[in-house]
Amino acid sequence: MSTDFVLLPEPQQSIRLDGDFEVAAGGSISVGARPSASLHRAARKLQEALSMVGQRWQLTPAGAETDADVRASIAINPYHVPRAQGYRITIEPDFLGIVAADDAGAFYAAATMRQIAEQFQGTGRLPCLRINDWPDFLTRGVMHDISKDKIPTLETIFGLVDMLAGLKVNQFQLHSENAFAYRDHKIVWADGTPVTGDDILALDEFCRERHVDLVANQNSFGHFERWFEHDEYKPLAESPEG
């Protein structure tokens, strides 16, 4: 099988090992002791990634008896992976192991496995390798301006956040001038399709599940044209006549 694949961003260390790892029927994935909800989500993402390559494996608690052959594991151990948000992936012919520094690291490991799986989809096998990865910058953000022309739907924003999280972006700034439905300032957004408070709450939960901090970014007086065009707000302008 071809062993060429691309990872974005590139891991700090990536070494190709001899052999292949078969994702055959009857396997299972061990999930670390006392797992958080976040680790469970990372384990499910790993499960989905392996399913793209071969068979779907069940998730089992670490140390639990199971009829399935434990062929993979995902766990958190900051002693083995000391750098925040870091992770280690080891794929050998008979086992796939993931160890992460924290919940975020486990999520990023699963995201890396997803990228690998997409490039070996349907082959039934993965190349053996060892990856050690951690961020150079603990905060990695993207600002998205939703005030220019069409305001995106919540589903579109969800899709963007999901893609960015898969690329290990962990801060998402939603930049707005008149795109938020302020309760006491309806005249500013009444003719549009603004993002509502309920939308923001749903987006915040969606972001948190992907280890992304949602940051509000509201234009202020220097970029308030769509506010100052209304008589109620013109007194706030330094040059009300433009």
Please name every model-derived segment:
Residues 1-140:
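Contiguous, structured surface segment used for ligand recognition
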Residues 137-242:
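Substrate-binding cleft of carbohydrate-active enzyme catalytic domains
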